[in-house]
A protein has these predicted regions:
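Cytosolic covalent-transfer regions centered on His/Cys nucleophiles
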Residues: 1-176
Length: 176
């Protein structure tokens, strides 16, 4: 799965105006709804808030990844928003969040939201990617940055898989 299968131009908000966590959630939910991804906005918003009440999705390094898997979602999607000023998102590192990725998955969506969460987290560990996203000036640029980082992550996963299969082949030869 590629992030840009779920993140599209119509789910990107380049300049969030909210100054608090609830406002950011409202803006990102609106972005998903405007793109036709939600069938029940209040239910989806409630699911996001319920998830946030369990523990913050402000993971630190200026990133928040609110997410919910609920029947109010028509099709899996990711909304992206950024705030140059930063928002107190009650992040784990107590720093303001600047980059927001809201993952919306339908209730029967299998592993989609977990796969997206894992892949996004991996991509966003790269400080260079975060910096490029903060400075991006258009939805197209955001998609290019994510796509390039996704390509890089895929190459690294493939190289690691090849390395592991070589190691296991080497180990099995030692038994003979």
């Amino acid at each position: 799965m590629r992030i840009t299968e779920l993140l599209t131009k119509d789910t990107i908000a380049m300049d969030l105006s909210s100054s608090d966590k609830n406002g950011v959630i409202d803006e990102l939910v609106h972005q998903l709804d405007k793109a036709g991804k939600l069938s029940d906005v209040p239910s989806f918003k409630e699911a996001i808030h319920n998830r946030e009440s369990q523990s913050t999705t402000g993971i630190g390094e200026g990133i928040a990844i609110p997410h919910a898997k609920v029947s109010a979602v028509k099709s899996p999607a990711i909304a992206f928003g950024k705030s140059k000023a930063g928002v107190d998102y009650q992040s784990l590192d107590m720093q303001p969040a600047h980059l927001f990725f809201m993952i919306a998955a339908p209730e029967g969506g299998a592993q989609t939201h977990l796969d997206a969460l894992a892949k996004l987290s991996g991509i966003l560990m790269d400080e260079n990617v975060r910096e490029k996203l903060i400075n991006a000036s258009s939805p197209e640029e955001v998609l290019q940055i994510i796509d390039a980082a996704d390509d890089e992550a895929t190459k690294e996963e493939e190289a690691e898989a090849n390395e592991n299969s070589t190691v296991s082949t080497d180990n099995s030869n030692q038994d003979n």
